[in-house]
Amino acid sequence: MGQLPKPSKISFGTDGLRGRVDTMLTPALALQVGYWCGRVLQAEGPVLIGMDSRSSGSMLVAALTAGLTASGREVWTLGLCPTPAVPGLIRRYSAAGGLMVSASHNPPEDNGIKVFGATGSKLSPERQQAIEAGLCGGDGSGMALAASGAARHRPELLDDYRASLLSSVGQHRLDGVPIVLDLCWGSATACGAEVFSALGADLTVLHGDPDGTRINVNCGSTHLEALRRAVIEKGAAMGFGFDGDADRMLAVDGQGRVVDGDHVLFLWGSVLQEQGQLPDQRLVATVMSNLGFERAWQARGGLLDRTPVGDQHVHAEMVRTGAALGGEQSGHILSSAHGLAGDGVLTALQIASLCHAQQLSLAEWVDQSFQAYPQKLVNVRVENRERRKGWADCAPLSSLVQEAEASMAEDGRVLVRASGTEPLLRVMVEAADQAVVDHWTSSLAAAAELHLNAS
């Protein structure tokens, strides 16, 4: 039997593997990842593979398929689809697991691989480490090829995913509601316009075709300017912008104001609370969520659990506590009633249908929610991974963080963390006063730039 060559050291970040296709995420590496995923996944059944619209996607899917079939696995490729379609279809068809080829909100030249187990959840750290060990371990002697598995292209399975989106809103309709969708040239183009149109919405679509060279470029949830303009120009009730793989969404109300994940959690959570469908009145959010949100939710008698950044941490806490709803300020929203997978299109459908059912505009609903504290996030590029990850060991920077925290006391927060997907140190400051926020973000970002990038 043949053997596969051993790649250099790699590791999973906060959302799988991610990087530039021409340097880090090569076809050779994807073949290896496919092989070791096939070996590490424990359940029987096919392995599903979806992809976003990036130009490198088909190449990487082919390499992953080769690796998986080399491990003896049967593979079903889905083609273009949102990330949440993969875990949903894993559960529906009792698959062994699945992979999504996407770099989410990253630029077009990047790509990534997300891995899901038989329950539809992202792999545990232990399973990820087993794949890493296989990729990088020993002399490759354990990597003998198995008898080849089969591969089939199954795009028709996405009809089940679209049907699940429509059923998620029950009998609610959106007849005549003017809505703008920014599909980001990405995965949301596979279903976003179709499901909103099926519910009767008066739809305007931006960036509505799959385009791997323009995915995330000045559009979608990370660049809301075009969506905000379109909502105002069209006199729309609301707009929704998705990221490249459609697992997250940010909204815009009829006044052009951004409605982030904190507001989505508060609004959807309030409805569940009033319906008696929110155990312990609990929501799960991350350390990035706004203090104004937390205090307003507590004023409603609710509990807010915070986790580290990353929807996998939100997922784990929801499972641990039995929470019904959780998510991130950036727009990943997880609902236990809908499979605990972040799904931007599903979340947009929920918000639109709940607004319509209550006969409220999104702007009116947001005005009834909470006043966010001023919050500012600055990204400092730090190429040195060790310095970036170990920023707290930099005495001048950590001392300045402590000074900022002491000066704001209970009226503000500082959060400094290394990105899990990009060479960035993220500096966030939140306070009751905008001038205080501006002062400390500027000071902390300058200190990080000076001390972490020093030669």
Curated annotation (Swiss-Prot):
Phosphoserine: residues bearing it: S104
Enzyme active site: S104
GO CC terms, sorted: cytosol
CC cofactor note: Binds 1 Mg(2+) ion per subunit.
Keyword annotations of the record: Isomerase, Magnesium, Metal-binding, Phosphoprotein
Xref: InterPro entries: A-D-PHexomutase_a/b/a-I (IPR005844), A-D-PHexomutase_a/b/a-I/II/III (IPR016055), A-D-PHexomutase_a/b/a-II (IPR005845), A-D-PHexomutase_a/b/a-III (IPR005846), A-D-PHexomutase_C (IPR005843), A-D-PHexomutase_C_sf (IPR036900), A-D-PHexomutase_CS (IPR016066), Alpha-D-phosphohexomutase_SF (IPR005841)
Family per record: Belongs to the phosphohexose mutase family.
Entry-linked HAMAP family: GlmM_B
Record's protein name: Phosphoglucosamine mutase
Reaction(s) catalysed by this chain's protein: alpha-D-glucosamine 1-phosphate = D-glucosamine 6-phosphate
Biological process terms in GO annotation: carbohydrate metabolic process; peptidoglycan biosynthetic process; UDP-N-acetylglucosamine biosynthetic process
Cofactor: Mg(2+)
Residues that span the membrane, as ranges: none
Coiled-coil blocks: none
Post-translational modification: Activated by phosphorylation.
Gene3D superfamilies: Alpha-D-Glucose-1,6-Bisphosphate, subunit A, domain 3, Alpha-D-phosphohexomutase, C-terminal domain
Record carries keyword Transferase: no
Organism domain of life: Bacteria
Binding-site residues for Mg(2+), renumbered to this chain: S104, D243, D245, D247
EC class name: isomerase
Function, in words: Catalyzes the conversion of glucosamine-6-phosphate to glucosamine-1-phosphate.
Annotated GO MF terms: magnesium ion binding; phosphoglucosamine mutase activity; phosphomannomutase activity
Protein EC: 5.4.2.10
